Amino acid sequence: MSNPGTRRNGSSIKIRLTVLCAKNLAKKDFFRLPDPFAKIVVDGSGQCHSTDTVKNTLDPKWNQHYDLYVGKTDSITISVWNHKKIHKKQGAGFLGCVRLLSNAISRLKDTGYQRLDLCKLNPSDTDAVRGQIVVSLQTRDRIGTGGSVVDCRGLLENEGTVYEDSGPGRPLSCFMEEPAPYTDSTGAAAGGGNCRFVESPSQDQRLQAQRLRNPDVRGSLQTPQNRPHGHQSPELPEGYEQRTTVQGQVYFLHTQTGVSTWHDPRIPSPSGTIPGGDAAFLYEFLLQGHTSEPRDLNSVNCDELGPLPPGWEVRSTVSGRIYFVDHNNRTTQFTDPRLHHIMNHQCQLKEPSQPLPLPSEGSLEDEELPAQRYERDLVQKLKVLRHELSLQQPQAGHCRIEVSREEIFEESYRQIMKMRPKDLKKRLMVKFRGEEGLDYGGVAREWLYLLCHEMLNPYYGLFQYSTDNIYMLQINPDSSINPDHLSYFHFVGRIMGLAVFHGHYINGGFTVPFYKQLLGKPIQLSDLESVDPELHKSLVWILENDITPVLDHTFCVEHNAFGRILQHELKPNGRNVPVTEENKKEYVRLYVNWRFMRGIEAQFLALQKGFNELIPQHLLKPFDQKELELIIGGLDKIDLNDWKSNTRLKHCVADSNIVRWFWQAVETFDEERRARLLQFVTGSTRVPLQGFKALQGSTGAAGPRLFTIHLIDANTDNLPKAHTCFNRIDIPPYESYEKLYEKLLTAVEETCGFAVE
């Protein structure tokens, strides 16, 4: 819908308003997502436009532009509405609005994209409003130059907020909110509306705010005395080009690295802004706790970055913009893959092995232990990973999987392998055949739990235990007994990637070297200790002692395959090369590599291919093998105290008999039975890295959902019921502890299946 209104001459100017997207809109219906559209009104001029409607999303993307004629006293109101509800009653379907006064319009135009917070129509409105809208204002008397290709992937990370509260401990923002009366274009006060007003400060105020935020840049900022007069813009830094998209949107390209950004490099980046769309910037930004000196791309020398990784190629578009082709995964990107080494270096600086500076003042309670800092940094890196993966998830469609419990392995294999990787990234919806459960996360968790129990079972021959008394999984070198074993390993890799992508966990523990191989890191002798202690002890003895009069080995080792003793040469003609004091280090190194890669090269590459189809390899660079193990498998140890302290009670209190008896029963359970209880209620035996306070509930929920004990009014002959999507267990008011224990045990051990109430 569009109403251009009347074109006014004289003092009015033509402005192109681009409405790019909205983010984190309020979800007001539990079972339905809104159909958002944006409405743009130039107050007092009769100009009115509406964007297209985007179906079923809280993060709509429009990328539509409108040419507006704005006078000196005009203001622009942008409101977001739910198309499903606008016809029900007056004001229904309102999701938030923002109003730009004339002063703000003049300040914001030609500054690229800005993210504005949505607010209520009236302060007295009870409906929740949250989220942001990303827009840009551009005068139409400019002529754009350069190419028309632009990388839009980094737009949602551009935290160019127009206003920001400056609470205690927070830096000042370059733009500040200033209360103003609600006036129409004539200046008369108007009633009924209370949209957020945006009033830009003067240049002097912005300079002062920048000085307060970062004293180190005082000398680099222009003062009002030496500032250029008029609207003449300073020159761009060396290596930058200003270009314009087909829709008239201005962006900036760093020609040496091929990185594009909506942020003007001539303007100091406000606190909270992530310059550009490079993932390395995002990692550095979040890991440093939102402290923000913008990264100078001029300091990046392409020669110092070295050659491209294997399988990568540099190409350029018709307009001359450089992009990079990954032939390994058949993908393209504008970001130089060599910049991820910089990101990895920044993350390595956070390792706890480095000494931590002590605070100059404050109590001992304020000091941070290395373990605490390490955990905090790991949580931050995990948040960044989740954010990067969420950007890759399609907004529409579902990844629907329907299997039977009896044939869960084969049916899952057939359905997963016929899907494309981009289909697996859609919202996961799992259904067990013959059951009516709706999957809001709990059914998918149970599906993964049951599938892993089958898929990783050594009975199928894909995996084996590392030793007879250490039950850690490794790839079975004799898996080729199954002619389709490589396809099954590809499937296993996809399942692991699917779990990580959708925030679930794999119920199975692999060896530490397996995770190092997934990260592409070399395996060392120390990695052997947790897998094969006896062999590790023997190889360490060889290194630490003189073997000349003791050992009579060659560079040839024996191994058992299907009852036959086979020999393997660690190097060419190894059977004729004796192990001596001079070459024993080479022998140990080759032996360790052979021990972990013996006959599993093809299997591992197939598994890694499936995993990287959903989790790109460069996103794993900041993590080590222990962290990757936590990302894939979560915590397998259940902390009962953490469980108790992060449990929500519904229709009961901590002193209720039901609650006391429940925890009394849990305390009598062994580790295995506690894990079964947790799986019964949440769908998974694994706990998130942050503990029980981070238990995930329904898919798409804004935050975690705590474990919940719900006392219900039901017949005490009934068994407890679990709602895995909400991490809730419903318990009838049993008369005694013995009855609760019996019913709880029966429900956990003897029942399965989903239904809809």
Swiss-Prot record:
Effect on the protein upon substituting residue 28 to A: Fails to ubiquitinate RHOA
Positions of post-translational Phosphoserine modification: 200
Localization of this protein: Cytoplasm; Cell membrane
Membrane topology term: Peripheral membrane protein
Cellular component, GO annotation: axon; cytoplasm; cytosol; extracellular exosome; neuronal cell body; nucleoplasm; plasma membrane
Protein purpose: E3 ubiquitin-protein ligase that acts as a negative regulator of BMP signaling pathway. Mediates ubiquitination and degradation of SMAD1 and SMAD5, 2 receptor-regulated SMADs specific for the BMP pathway. Promotes ubiquitination and subsequent proteasomal degradation of TRAF family members and RHOA. Promotes ubiquitination and subsequent proteasomal degradation of MAVS. Acts as an antagonist of TGF-beta signaling by ubiquitinating TGFBR1 and targeting it for degradation. Plays a role in dendrite formation by melanocytes.
Protein name, entry field: E3 ubiquitin-protein ligase SMURF1
Organism: Homo sapiens
Lineage: Eukaryota, Metazoa, Chordata, Craniata, Vertebrata
